[in-house]
């Protein structure tokens, strides 16, 4: 599954992962939490990132909150995570060109 991975203080990078729960948990370093961005696009973060005082990553105005720890942008189809679309991939990459 094609995703965009964004670590704190780093530029985003496109990655290919298995799409299994464990692969997402490995990337976010713990239990996952889904944050809806828009139809067909979601953000997967560490559910306990703030509790574990993970490093700040970026501010997400849609939910008026600071995202901490590693974040993974994924596509969505219903309740399933999918490859991020070409247009969403481009949008995410452009948004995070500056670290």
Label each residue range with its predicted role.
Residues 1-99:
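Domain-length accessory/inserted modules outside core catalytic folds
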């Amino acid at each position: 599954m094609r995703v965009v991975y964004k670590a704190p203080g780093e530029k985003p990078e496109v990655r290919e992962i298995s799409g299994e729960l464990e692969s997402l948990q490995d990337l976010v370093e713990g239990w996952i939490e889904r944050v809806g961005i828009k139809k067909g696009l979601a953000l997967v973060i560490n559910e306990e990132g703030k509790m574990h005082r993970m490093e700040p990553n970026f501010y997400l105005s849609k939910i008026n909150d600071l995202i901490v720890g590693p974040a993974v942008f994924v596509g969505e189809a219903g309740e399933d995570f999918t490859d991020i679309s070409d247009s969403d991939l481009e949008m995410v990459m452009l948004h995070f060109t500056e670290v």
